[in-house]
Each structure stands twice: as structure tokens, then as C-alpha cells.
Amino acid sequence: METMPNWLMQRAFLTPDRIAIETKEEKITFFALHEKVVSVCENLAYLQIKKGQKVAVLMKNGMEMIAVIHALSYIGAIAVLLNTRLSREELLWQMEDAEVICLLTDQIFEPEQVPVYTFEEVENGPKQSVVIQEEFSLAEAMTIIYTSGTTGKPKGVILTYGNHWASAVGSSLNLGLRDDDCWLACMPMFHVGGLSLLMKNIMYGMRVLLVPKYDPDFIHQAIQTKGVTIISVVAKMLTDLLERLGNETYPSSLRCMLLGGGPAPKPLLEACVQKGIPVYQTYGMTETSSQICTLSADYMLTKVGSAGKPLFPCQLRIEKDGKVMPANVEGEIVVKGPNVTRGYFKREDATRETIVDGWLHTGDLGYVDDEGFLYVLDRRSDLIISGGENIYPAQIEEVLLSHPLVLEAGVVGKSDETWGQVPVAFVVKAGQVTEEEMIHFCEEKLAKYKVPKAVYFLHELPRNASKKLLRRELRQLLEEK
């Protein structure tokens, strides 16, 4: 069984005095972080948490959550990371499904079925001597993260130590590493994008500037004053930052804006090019331990809309009806690599359907061009089929977002007796604009069947904690209308 030294322990040994985590309030070195984690381990040992057991973690970004995630790995327990924005019912369902033995939280939460401990209680509680894992077995499960369940009930994605290691290595081979690197972390750590930064932090020995909750003003300031070199964003965050930037630009020390969470509108990318902001578009999911494809900033304008090529250890192909498709033919995106999950917890059928001979069927639609660059069209489940024609919501959203008075746009399919489905749009506007004007604007830029049949105006669009658009909630709004 392949093993490695315990990552944080090894990092604390190699570069003990280097800053690991910085927040508004404090800075902590790798050695101090390791000591803090060992202390939390002794508290957890008193609670009888043991290797192989599953422990639910319901916490917001902060030093406490970082300590808990590392402490569980020191013990060999599996962290089941819960989304703080879920309803009580959803959280209870996931805890039961994951068979957790207890819940560690920084919130007031009282499930009936398992013991609940707040971080404060744990940290101030009794301690017990503990055997720490000095080595990690790469085949063992480290975390379980539930997919958002765009179709059916959420599924617990098992990610091993090996998956997390391969993900960090693949990213570093793509982006490179610098001594002065500082990654600004504003993505929630219960999502794989946020969690992967914790892994990179200790593997690379890289400073992480931790932002507990999404705060565009602080992030904008930090990029200018805190030596931030890399930041992970989604399109909505990038729009917020550009708004604050106005006619200015960011310092040249910012070498990478890693943009994920779905296709980005062209006008947004063009604005970034004008300002010299290096945007790396990326494609990934929970099942791939975060990114699996990335487009470097060199190709920002020549390959607008592409998510790039697979990371060095990964492979990608397009399949349709079980056959591999040539370039420029649409189909399902299928990926393979050491960062890809081995499957879903207690969901053998879903695992067998999704992962075939190591190839993960993503459920996303796309194509590769003649040079092998990936273009993600949409989620298969978001596809609108109107009169036999495939309509990708992302394409209509891009057109809507190019209108000067549109801040946000979301498109979903509505049942239609004649066509099966027709597209309708939800828009957040920045000034006076009517439904008729929006429809006319689209008619000039889109095929007739792609033009939204209705446009509804909202104050804001529903998004998850990573600021990804929640189309299923737009569908619910549509049903209520």
C-alpha cells in the first residue's frame, strides 16, 4: 500500500516558520498550525473518535475548520463536509446517509440521531493521549463531500488521500510554484474547490489568505495590498471585482485568476483582457477533486470560452452512444486521472453507471477542437430540447449578459405543448429595460428557437455558496408563476 508522510506534519518539519494561514485577525506558521492540530486531536480522542469513523463537519471558513479537517486526518477519521447553506432536513439526511458518529460544528444545531459538539466545547474540553497517523495511505478515504444533487438525491463523493495529492500535483505542474505565492481563499471549504486549497497550502508550503465569507470589498483590497498571486473565482465574483476596479488594473504580482463554476460570458473575459487580468478558465467537479482541465491565460482570447486541456496526469475524451467522438463533435465529457474519485458512498449502482474502466462520465456536454481544447456547453440535465433542437442555457445567458443593463442572467427550459420545451430567462437589471427590449436584443443575436419566450426580472439570482447559479431554483420559480 503506497504511503506518504503526514502532509502537515512534514510541512511543519520542512518549513516550520513559514506563514501557513493569514486572516484579517491573525497569522499562523506551519509549526504552530501543527501544534494546534495535535491539541485538537487530543480533544477528539477524548470523544472516542477513531480511525475509519465518519465525522460530520458543519463549519464556516476559519482557523477552527482548518484545525478540525487536519485533526481528523491525523486520527485517520473521514471528514464528511456539510454545506452550511443547506436546510435542516437536507443536513439530517446527509448525516444519516453518511453514517456519521457525531457532528462537529460552530453553529447551534441539534440533530436527534448523533452527538453534537461545538468547536468551543471540543477545544476547551478534556484531552486524551492519541496515536497520530505519521503516514497517510493514499488509497484510504480522507473526505466525503455530497454533490449538489442536480438530479435526484445528493451522492457522497469519496475522495482519498491519493485523489487530493494528485489534484495538487496536477495543478502545480500547470500553474507552477513560486516562493512568494499567496492564494486568496474565499471559496467555502465544504466545497472541493475550497478544500483543495487547504491541501495545496500544506503540500506546496504556500501562504493562504483566508476570507471567512465572501466579501468583495476586502478581496479587492487584499489583491492590491496583501501580495496575493492566485485567487479562485466564479464569474459572479469576477464581475464584482471588475466593478470595483473601475478604470484601474491589479498589480502584476497577481499572476492567476482561476475561474471555475461553469462557462464564463465572453464580454467578461474581454474586459479582463483589456485590464491585463490573467484569467485561467478551469473545469472540474467534486468527483475530480476540483479542476481537471485548465486554460492558461496565454489562450484567453484565441480560445475564448474554452476550459483548456487536461492537467498533466489526466485524460479527456468526448463520447456519444458509447463511442469516442472526433474533434468538433458534441457529446458527453468523459475524464480519467489519479484525482478522480473511486465512487459514491453506498451507491454501487451510481458508481457503476458513472465510472467505467476508470473513466468518469461527467454528465456535462461539450466538444474538443482540432487542437484538443475543451469547450463545455452545459450540464446535460440543464439542456433544453425544443422541437428536437438542443439549446444550451449558457449560450443565451452569454448574449443576455452582453447587454449593458444586465447584471446577471439565468436561463431554464419551460414545458411547451408545441415544442416540448422553450427557453425563458431570469434577469437582474442595472437600469430601466423592458421584457420586450430584452427579447428584441436576443432576436438580433440568436436563432429564433433560442430566443427566450419570456423574461422575468429578479433582485438577485439564486446561487449556492460557491456563487454558482442554481437553475433548479429558477425552475421552481417558473412553476410558481
Curated annotation (Swiss-Prot):
GO molecular function annotations of the record: ATP binding; o-succinylbenzoate-CoA ligase activity
Pfam family, one: AMP-binding
Pathway(s) of this molecule: Quinol/quinone metabolism; 1,4-dihydroxy-2-naphthoate biosynthesis; 1,4-dihydroxy-2-naphthoate from chorismate: step 5/7; Quinol/quinone metabolism; menaquinone biosynthesis
EC id: 6.2.1.26
Catalytic reaction(s) noted: 2-succinylbenzoate + ATP + CoA = 2-succinylbenzoyl-CoA + AMP + diphosphate
One Gene Ontology biological process: menaquinone biosynthetic process
Keyword field contains ATP-binding: yes
Keywords, comma-separated and alphabetical: ATP-binding, Ligase, Menaquinone biosynthesis, Nucleotide-binding
InterPro entries in UniProt: AMP-bd_C, AMP-bd_C_sf, AMP-binding_CS, AMP-dep_synth/lig_dom, ANL_N_sf, MenE
Keyword ATP-binding: yes
Family per similarity comment: Belongs to the ATP-dependent AMP-binding enzyme family. MenE subfamily.
NCBIfam families tied to this protein: menE (TIGR01923), PRK03640.1 (NF002966)
Its biological purpose: Converts 2-succinylbenzoate (OSB) to 2-succinylbenzoyl-CoA (OSB-CoA).
Entry protein name: 2-succinylbenzoate--CoA ligase
Organism: Bacillus cytotoxicus (strain DSM 22905 / CIP 110041 / 391-98 / NVH 391-98)
